[in-house]
């Protein structure tokens, strides 16, 4: 009987340690570690004192869903899952002139939208 009490005590101590560790972690930091949300950030290269230039930077997440039967029939190599990536892009922007004559987009609002330009 004494043996069961020891096992129960060890299990309770280990459970409380695990719960303590989980409770002390910040919410969601393990999920998106090292990748901030999509938002405006100042571009240090183009910004000058009194006239900051902003760019949209950060992460957006892709989604996956079952491939519709109609689409599967037209695929050369049919796949069961279709994925759609989203990128952090400017929702609105203004044109700005920097470094004398270079025209750049100064982003004013960001959102996650369909990716049009993919890196190869």
Curated annotation (Swiss-Prot):
Pfam families: Hormone_6 (PF00236)
Disulfide bonds: 35-59, 38-88, 56-110, 60-112, 87-115
One GO term (biological process): positive regulation of steroid biosynthetic process
Cross-referenced Gene3D superfamilies: Cystine-knot cytokines (2.10.90.10)
Listed InterPro entries: Cystine-knot_cytokine, Glyco_hormone
Domain of life: Eukaryota
Keywords: Disulfide bond, Glycoprotein, Hormone, Secreted, Signal
Major place of residence: secreted
Places the protein is found: Secreted
GO molecular function: follicle-stimulating hormone activity; hormone activity
A GO term from the CC aspect: extracellular space
Glycosylation sites: 80, 106
Signal peptide coordinates: 1-24
Functional description taken from the UniProt entry: Shared alpha chain of the active heterodimeric glycoprotein hormones thyrotropin/thyroid stimulating hormone/TSH, lutropin/luteinizing hormone/LH and follitropin/follicle stimulating hormone/FSH. These hormones bind specific receptors on target cells that in turn activate downstream signaling pathways.
Family assignment from sequence similarity: Belongs to the glycoprotein hormones subunit alpha family.
Family annotation (PANTHER family): GLYCOPROTEIN HORMONE ALPHA CHAIN, GLYCOPROTEIN HORMONES ALPHA CHAIN
Assembly, per entry: Heterodimer. The active hormones thyrotropin, lutropin and follitropin are heterodimers composed of CGA, a common alpha chain described here and a unique beta chain which confers their biological specificity to the hormones: TSHB for thyrotropin, LHB for lutropin and FSHB for follitropin.
Protein name: Glycoprotein hormones alpha chain
Organism, scientific name: Rattus norvegicus
Gene: Cga
């Amino acid at each position: 009987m004494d043996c069961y009490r020891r096992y129960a005590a060890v299990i309770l101590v280990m459970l409380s340690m695990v719960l303590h560790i989980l409770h002390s972690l910040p919410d969601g930091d393990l999920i998106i570690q090292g990748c901030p949300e999509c938002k405006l950030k100042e571009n240090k290269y183009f910004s000058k004192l009194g006239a900051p230039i902003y760019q949209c930077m950060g992460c957006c997440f892709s989604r996956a869903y079952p491939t519709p039967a109609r689409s599967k029939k037209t695929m050369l190599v049919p796949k069961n899952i279709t994925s759609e990536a989203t990128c952090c892009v400017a929702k609105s922007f203004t044109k700005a002139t920097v470094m004398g004559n270079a025209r750049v987009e100064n982003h004013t609002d960001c959102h996650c939208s369909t990716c049009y330009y993919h890196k190869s």
